[in-house]
Amino acid sequence: MIAHHDRNGVCCRALFCSALQPSDAPTPDMVATAISRAIQQFGIGGCASWMAQEFGDHPDAAASRMRWVRQLIAQRSATRQQAAA
């Protein structure tokens, strides 16, 4: 089983690589679908590689996107924890 923080890391990398944009005003279902599609399309390692490339090529844009991604994943985790309680 993947540890919670590792799962969040995988989800962050996958969501970073997805086509989902802040302007989409993503719902939790949209986030889950984007994560699944990115993992299917690129694989876990591919998502990490693509993300690293973006940070190398466009560090400011990548940092901004990662802040947004981490916010979405944190909200997703909080919602899941509340539902489990």
Please tell me what each predicted stretch does.
Residues 2, 66-74, 80-85:
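General marker for long, soluble alpha-helical cores
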Residues 2-4, 23-25, 35-41:
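A short, ordered amphipathic alpha-helix with a cationic face
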Residues 4-29:
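N-terminal acidic leader/helix
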Residues 21, 79-80:
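Short helix-capping/linker segments at secondary-structure and domain boundaries
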Residues 29-74:
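Amphipathic, hydrophobic secondary-structure cores in small proteins
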